[in-house]
């Protein structure tokens, strides 16, 4: 059976760390920022890690 292809859309949006975690950027940053609080905008600058439940679904795509 041939190897599964990596999903290009996911490959462009995430990075896999050395420990195997999936690192991603926060959503809701691109526009309409005047409606968001300072705290929301500041916290969305940090990257976050994918939750374990999501990781189980996405590991087959990478």
Curated annotation (Swiss-Prot):
Entry GO CC: cytosolic large ribosomal subunit
InterPro entries: Ribosomal_bL35, Ribosomal_bL35-like, Ribosomal_bL35_CS, Ribosomal_bL35_sf
Gene3D superfamilies from the UniProt entry: 4.10.410.60
Gene Ontology MF terms: structural constituent of ribosome
UniProt GO BP: translation
Ribonucleoprotein recorded as keyword: yes
Keywords: Ribonucleoprotein, Ribosomal protein
Homology family: Belongs to the bacterial ribosomal protein bL35 family.
PANTHER family associated with the record: 54S RIBOSOMAL PROTEIN BL35M, LARGE RIBOSOMAL SUBUNIT PROTEIN BL35M
Name the UniProt record assigns to this protein: Large ribosomal subunit protein bL35
Organism: Mycoplasmopsis synoviae (strain 53)
């Amino acid at each position: 059976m041939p190897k599964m292809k990596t999903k290009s859309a996911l490959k462009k949006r995430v990075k896999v760390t050395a420990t195997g975690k999936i690192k991603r950027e926060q959503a809701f940053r691109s526009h309409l920022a005047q409606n968001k609080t300072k705290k929301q905008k500041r916290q969305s600058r940090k990257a976050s890690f994918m939750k374990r439940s999501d990781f189980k679904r996405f590991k087959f795509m990478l």
